[in-house]
Design a protein with these regions (language model features):
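Amphipathic, small/basic residue-rich leader segments at the start of a protein or domain
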Residues: 1-89, 112, 116-119, 341, ...
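A short, Trp-centered hydrophobic/proline-enriched beta-strand micro-motif
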Residues: 120-128, 176
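Glycine-rich beta->alpha junctions and the first turn(s) of the following alpha-helix
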Residues: 201-297, 355-356
């Protein structure tokens, strides 16, 4: 415990020293629904983190990580959130694809992709959902057909992905596609690594209710990727895709909950300022929200490393956060229903939290 306390102090001190100067203006930027904010500056921040050794904490040392324990990763995410540090831009590579390649990739794939992920030199997006395959992910229809043989063989990809976060700025996409014609459901799927900067890829940003456009439609029309950029076995992509989702629901959720507590504390102050706190029904709902947040934290701590438990944690926090958005509108009353052009933070929270139970796997 002493070592963990010292690690927490080190993280806290480093963040205090470095979230200053050119990076001071980034505090609090880039959260859900606001991923477009100060994007280039946040890339530089991520690279600053990488240079100091604060990216890829949980990766094994032999792959460029710190080999940090689960407890240390939890501490880092909590302190990162408490410091108000900006949302990361390299998280798809660092937290999803990187661990997937370490667990299931080839030596060549790890050698090619892990170093630039760690240094935040190549950014990734996740090509899962399609117009006809969202929560029912096994219904994906985007196809990939092998063209040629030997070292020059390539997969030719045709189809559409949607709700693809940050596809408009990513250099690469890890995509779930159907490589066995005539196959259905979980069979016949493969997990491909696809370069985005090529003639066969078109990206169209989707404007959201919040005004942001970090989600995208991605169209593959004869896009190509080398045959050896299949992660896992050809036809075994479902297993790989599910492994990626398990990594997505890891230790970072504890840091996310620090942000939730900050939102709840701010809402309590709004209720106090507006007089809504005098309403016993509002007080009860705020109290229940605080209790729910504590339950969420203890459940997340208890189930770290357990895939099924992590899925339950996702369900718990998604419903809690959506409820917070609804409670914010109740506290604000009529003021929550109107705006003069730009959405308030509370309106943005309410609108974006409607998607919490869907994104990241329903």
């Amino acid at each position: 415990m002493v070592a963990l306390a010292e690690f927490r102090a080190t993280v806290r001190e480093w963040l205090a020293d470095n979230l200053s100067g050119e990076f001071a203006a980034l505090r609090g930027l880039g959260g859900p629904g606001r991923e477009h904010e100060a994007y280039d500056e946040r890339v530089e921040w991520d690279r600053h983190l990488a240079a100091a050794g604060w990216t890829c904490l949980g990766w094994p040392v032999e792959y460029g990580g710190r080999g940090a324990s689960v407890e240390e990763r939890v501490v880092f995410h909590e302190e990162y959130a408490r410091a108000g540090a900006p949302a990361r831009v390299g998280h798809f590579g660092e937290e999803l694809l990187g661990p997937t390649l370490i667990a299931l990739g080839t030596d060549a794939q790890r050698a090619r992709f892990l170093p630039p992920i760690r240094r935040v030199e190549e950014l990734w997006c996740q090509g899962y959902s399609e117009p006809g395959a969202g929560s029912d992910l096994a219904s994906v229809s985007t196809s990939a057909v092998l063209d040629g043989s030997g070292d020059g063989a390539e997969w030719v990809i045709t189809g559409q992905k949607v709700w693809t976060s940050l596809a408009h700025v990513a250099q690469w996409c890890f995509a779930l596609v159907r490589t066995e014609p005539g196959s259905t459901r979980h069979a016949g799927l493969s997990y491909l690594l696809v370069p985005m900067d090529q003639p066969g890829v078109e990206v169209r940003p989707i404007e959201q209710l919040t005004g942001g456009s970090e989600f995208n439609e991605v169209f593959f029309d004869g896009a190509r990727t080398p045959a050896d950029l299949v992660v896992g076995e050809v036809g075994g992509g479902w297993r790989v895709a599910m492994a990626t989702l398990e990594f997505e629901r890891g230790a970072s959720t504890l840091g996310q909950q620090v942000g939730f507590r900050r939102e709840l504390d701010a809402l309590i102050e709004v209720a106090r300022d507006t007089g809504a706190l005098d309403d016993p029904v509002v007080r009860e709902k705020l109290t229940r929200a605080r209790i729910g947040l504590d339950v969420m934290r203890w459940h997340a701590l208890r189930t770290i490393g357990d895939a099924a438990g992590a899925s339950v944690t996702k369900l718990v926090w998604a419903n809690w956060h959506r409820g917070l958005g609804e409670l914010a509108m109740e506290v604000l009353g009529a003021a929550g229903l109107v705006h003069g052009g730009d959405l308030s933070d509370w309106q943005r929270l309410f609108l974006f939290s409607r998607a919490d139970t869907i994104y990241g796997g329903a």
